[in-house]
Structure formats: structure tokens, C-alpha cells
């Protein structure tokens, strides 16, 4: 069952500017800080996230182990490795989290293939294109979902992105 935004365990893989903006929006909506986990390799960014009161680590597998939502907020050149790393870590999970990619220029098909790995199973994936006004809570986001994303997962994604966007729009291509 898909949890509500208030109850969801949300993991950010990457702690850059857009992740920080979304986290700020979530905290402004009184989301429990302990439900937000950020995996970030750079100490400076990790410390900024810790200053917000959320949990931090350098270990993607640890951060995403029991997540309901994983936000792929990494640089495009490292996305494949991150997805493949999690694919092996999630092989024993009975249900997979919804993955929301804000990584620029990476297709759903690529993300799905990277997650499938040896298991042949990809999580439900949503691709989001937030714009820079999201950095100050005034954004607009275009969202595109893979076919296996449920209505409840779409609602959760809309609520999450609504924390930094004045408008969210689902598109079909």
C-alpha cells in the first residue's frame, strides 16, 4: 500500500540544490524530518542536509533500504551506477519504492533497464522536470510516469512535488 506524504519514508540520492529545495518544501509542510534520508558523497552538501535536521549518509543502499520513495537527484553521469547499485540491494524486497528521477536528460527506459539488472524487475518510475523557480518554492513541474505507476503513487508524487511547485502537470509523453 502506498503511504501518504505525511507517512512516507523519502530518500534522496544526491543532496544538491534541487534536493535541498524539495526537502525545504517538505519540511515547510511539516513532514517528519526522521522520514527524510539523504545519501550524499560530498561532505559540504551532506552537512547542509544535516543542518536541516534530516538523516544523512554516504551509503545509497543504507539510505534506500526501507524507503517508500527514492528521489534520484544525482548528476546524469553517475545515475547508471547508482541505479545498478540499488538494483542488487533491493533484490530481496517484497515491494519496490517509487523512484522519482530529477536527473536531467535520462529516459525512463534507461532508468528501468539499469534497475532491472539481474532480477529483471524495475521499480515504478516517475520522471520529473522541475524548473529553477522550484528552488524558492515557486516552481512548475512536468511529470511523466512509467505504465506500472499506480494512481496512489502518482498522487504521492504530486503531493511531494507540490511542496516546491505552484503547478504540477502529468504528461503522457
Predicted regions mapped to residue ranges:
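Rossmann-like NAD(P)(H) cofactor-binding subdomain of soluble oxidoreductases
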Residues: 52, 60-65, 69-72, 76-143
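Internal alpha-helical scaffold of NAD(P)-dependent oxidoreductase catalytic cores
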Residues: 110-124, 140-173
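Short alpha-helical
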Residues: 17, 43-44, 77-78, 106, ...
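NAD(P)+-binding Rossmann beta1-loop-alpha1 motif at the extreme N-terminus of oxidoreductases
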Residues: 1-66, 138
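Predominant activation on well-ordered alpha-helical scaffold segments within soluble catalytic domains
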Residues: 23-24, 80, 112, 158
Amino acid at each position: 500500500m502506498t503511504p501518504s506524504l505525511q507517512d512516507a519514508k523519502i530518500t534522496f540520492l544526491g543532496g544538491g540544490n534541487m534536493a535541498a529545495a524539495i526537502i525545504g518544501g517538505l519540511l515547510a509542510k511539516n513532514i517528519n524530518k526522521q522520514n527524510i534520508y539523504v545519501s550524499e558523497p560530498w561532505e559540504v552538501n551532506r552537512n547542509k542536509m544535516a543542518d536541516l535536521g534530516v538523516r544523512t549518509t554516504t551509503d545509497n543502499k543504507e539510505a534506500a533500504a526501507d524507503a517508500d520513495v527514492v528521489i534520484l537527484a544525482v548528476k546524469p553521469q553517475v545515475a547508471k551506477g547508482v541505479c545498478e547499485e540499488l538494483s542488487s540491494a533491493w533484490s530481496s524486497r517484497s515491494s519496490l519504492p517509487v523512484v522519482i528521477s530529477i536527473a536531467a536528460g535520462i529516459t525512463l527506459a534507461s532508468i528501468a533497464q539499469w534497475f532491472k539488472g539481474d532480477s529483471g524487475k524495475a521499480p515504478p518510475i516517475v520522471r520529473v522536470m522541475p524548473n529553477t523557480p522550484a528552488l524558492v518554492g515557486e516552481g512548475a513541474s512536468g511529470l511523466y510516469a512509467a505504465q506500472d505507476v499506480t494512481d496512489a503513487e502518482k498522487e504521492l508524487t504530486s503531493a511531494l512535488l507540490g511542496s516546491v511547485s505552484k503547478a504540477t502537470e502529468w504528461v503522457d509523453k
